[in-house]
A protein has these predicted regions:
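A short acidic, Gly/Pro-enriched loop at the edge of an enzyme's catalytic core
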Residues: 108-120
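Conserved Class I S-adenosyl-L-methionine
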Residues: 31, 58-60, 196-272
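A short glycine-rich, Lys/Arg-flanked "PGG" loop and its adjoining helix->strand segment in the class I
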Residues: 133-145
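Conserved catalytic/acceptor-binding region of the Class I
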Residues: 148-211, 223-230
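A short SAM/SAH-binding and catalytic strip from SAM-dependent methyltransferases
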Residues: 119-131
Length: 272
């Protein structure tokens, strides 16, 4: 079993965090929309028939896919009830339906859906899953023989500037950690063929560290790690972290924030 248990929290913590963020999520989800749009563009030709969107969130990707003529049905699966409720209230295309469930338990969340979907997609969601093997096993379970898995997730260089700044203060883990590429590839190859992973760093600019940390909190993406430093976010420590990050300002006076994005494409492994 390939898991991410050293990095990530209890699944209910993630569900609660994103439910709380649902109503304000789209207001600060610039990166999420950018990655989602790139994912859809890269998947041109794949999006057809019946589609499952894992970690559908506010429904941004699901709704876009439902507008494609070649797509006949889109199921949005999310672990956060708040996200499901918000998506249902915002999107009313008859091709859409929503399901509460855990990406690590797809057969349980979608009973009777074996070999049902022509495509499973996911944009910036599976990085929150402890057990990648369970995720990919579930994806393979519900794909048709000629089906594809197409998703975007985050790599370990994500927010490396923020990690560095905290590293100038102490040795505790203040920033989310994500699995390295070799672990991701190994998990994928257990269940799929023709696996390809494109790594594309995306750098955003912020005016202040405070705005960055506020956005992360509003997105429900502040530190979820099981080994996150508890009781170590005092004013003095925060001030030192901010001072360290300030040293990274560029010539235009902006602070760099990097996200390491992995774009994945894989095909169903046919068992003979």
């Amino acid at each position: 079993m390939i898991s991410n248990t050293n990095f990530l929290p209890d699944v209910q913590d993630v569900a609660h965090s994103f439910s709380q963020a649902a109503k304000n999520y789209d207001q600060v989800a610039g990166l999420q929309r950018l990655v989602a749009d790139q994912l859809i563009t890269k998947g041109a030709g794949l999006y057809q028939g019946r589609v499952l969107d894992i970690g559908s969130g506010t429904g941004y990707v699901s709704a876009k896919l439902a507008n494609l003529e070649a797509v006949t049905k889109v199921t949005g699966l999310d672990i956060a009830q708040g996200m499901i409720d918000y998506a249902q209230s915002c999107h009313h295309n008859s091709k859409l339906n929503w399901q509460l469930g855990d990406a690590q338990q797809i057969p349980l969340a979608l009973p009777g859906h074996a070999s049902t979907y022509d495509l499973v997609t996911s944009s910036l969601a599976i990085q929150w899953c402890k057990n990648l093997d369970a995720v990919f096993s579930g994806v393979a379970h519900c794909l048709t023989e000629d089906g594809f898995f197409h998703c975007a997730t985050l790599g370990p260089q994500t927010l490396h500037q923020l990690k560095w700044a905290w590293g100038q203060v102490d040795n505790y883990q203040h920033v989310n950690e994500f699995v390295p590429l070799e672990v991701l590839r190994k998990a994928l190859k257990n269940h799929f063929v023709e696996v390809s992973v494109e790594c594309r760093p995306i750098e955003l600019k912020y005016k202040s560290v405070q705005q960055l940390t506020k956005d992360l909190k509003q997105l429900g993406a502040s530190n979820h790690n099981a080994y996150a430093a508890q009781g170590l976010m005092g004013v003095g420590r925060l001030r030192k972290m901010v001072q360290a990050y300030e040293s990274l300002r560029d010539e235009k006076g902006q602070l760099p924030v990097t996200y390491e994005v992995y774009y994945i494409k894989a095909k169903t492994k046919v068992v003979v």
